[in-house]
């Protein structure tokens, strides 16, 4: 006969302890730390809102549909993380930098590996009728020294607010994308289109969630950058168009004051706008 008094039964009050006690002694220490905290806060959430069976079923269905929306070009889980602010929080925790260094923001779900590498001054717009713009500036370290050989990976939406991978039958792959490398002076320059504001994909479960919360899905106009160099922390960031209507209500909380860039009209230039922006990279720890 089983001695029932020796069993550690699952109870509402002792749920956290019951689950965490099952963790094996050989569990990876970091995994143990993460899962112990996750169980603690997940159970606390369920107790705090007194989650119903119906609500839990809806949540499971939501996550299932979110998974079905993912493919090689679209990551609905990234969108979910973005709209609840988790992407920005994780990024903030992992990219603390000294004052004056360029700040990170969310990468977004539409970065594509393998974009063509161009000479400085090239135009990354393969097809489009948007407002033309020259993007330029320097890449320096925190002491003001130019960084030679910095890789600048850039991408943006079309004049209609869509990335190339969202319209494979309408835009050529790598439209409004390119890679550049700085010379000894740390300078960069390329041409493209002035970005426009756009809604994140809202035809899936994440868009439905925003609707239920009374939130719009729009992002302010921005150019994406990944700036990297040997010995320096990689910067994943945007430059935002100053004056955009959605700067104060970005659907993914990505706007930072230091990343808002002037887009200056250039009546005598070869493009309609000029968007100057300088990047400051922080040395890797130990460098």
Indicate residue ranges for each PLM-predicted region.
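Beta-strand-dominated extracellular/periplasmic modules and repeats
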Residues: 2-287
């Amino acid at each position: 006969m089983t001695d029932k008094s020796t069993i550690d039964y699952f109870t509402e009050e002792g749920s956290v302890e019951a689950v965490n006690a099952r963790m094996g002694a050989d569990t990876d220490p970091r995994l143990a730390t993460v899962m112990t905290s996750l169980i603690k806060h997940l159970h606390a959430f369920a107790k705090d809102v007194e989650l119903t069976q119906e609500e839990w079923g809806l949540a499971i269905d939501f996550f299932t549909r979110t998974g079905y929306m993912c493919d090689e070009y679209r990551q609905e889980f990234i969108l979910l993380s973005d709209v609840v602010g988790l992407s920005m929080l994780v990024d903030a925790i992992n990219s603390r930098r000294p004052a004056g260094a360029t700040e990170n923001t969310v990468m977004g779900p539409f970065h594509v590996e393998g974009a063509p590498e161009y000479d400085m001054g090239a135009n990354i717009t393969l097809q489009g009728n948007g407002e033309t713009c020259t993007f330029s500036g320097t890449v320096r370290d925190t002491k003001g020294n130019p960084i030679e050989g910095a890789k600048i990976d850039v991408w943006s939406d079309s004049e209609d607010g869509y990335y190339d991978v969202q319209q494979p039958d309408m835009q050529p792959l790598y439209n409004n994308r390119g890679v550049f490398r700085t010379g000894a002076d740390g300078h960069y320059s390329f041409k493209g289109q002035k970005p426009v504001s756009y809604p994140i994909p809202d035809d899936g479960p994440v868009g439905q969630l925003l609707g239920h919360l009374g939130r719009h899905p729009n992002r302010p106009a921005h150019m994406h950058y990944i700036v990297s160099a040997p010995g320096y922390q990689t910067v994943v960031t945007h430059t935002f168009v100053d004056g955009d209507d959605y700067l104060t209500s970005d659907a993914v909380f990505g706007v930072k004051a230091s990343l808002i860039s002037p887009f200056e009209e250039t009546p005598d230039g070869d493009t309609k706008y000029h968007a100057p922006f300088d990047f400051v990279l922080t040395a890797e720890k130990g460098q």
